Amino acid sequence: IFYQTSALASACHHSGIKISDGYLKATPPKAPVSAGYLTIHNNGSADINLTGARAAFAGMGAVHDMQMSNGVMTMTEVENGIMVSAGKIVSLAPGGLHLMFMGLNQQLKTGDEHTITLTFDKCGDLDVSLPVASNAMSGHNQSSHKNY
């Protein structure tokens, strides 16, 4: 399955940030939350920090992490953001770091595409358009890579 992650606008245009393998998790009707997954490539010469996310379809977005603690999977907000060192790659994937969208105002349907805004501490906001995929699909088999 092939999905395209496309740039819409960006204050990070010349910073060397590349987003790939992005998708949003499909939801049933009236679901209050969904998750977003993607890979951040920092091809620039400075470290960057992903500090937040937002989308028109959600009341709020945040960066979260899932970790196993005493045999129980827990999810917590990553309050200081996710550091992506210069020349490095960080993946946000199921079962680990991910974007959490809460207070959904619409169903996210498989095949649709939505714009989300990623906020980075050093280069501001980056808008990306992500496809919605069913729970059984993985965006990490995608071959499309976009430079922003």
Predicted feature residues:
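Compact, glycine-rich, soluble single-domain proteins
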Residues: 10-148
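N-terminal signal peptide c-region/cleavage motif recognized by signal peptidases
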Residues: 4-6
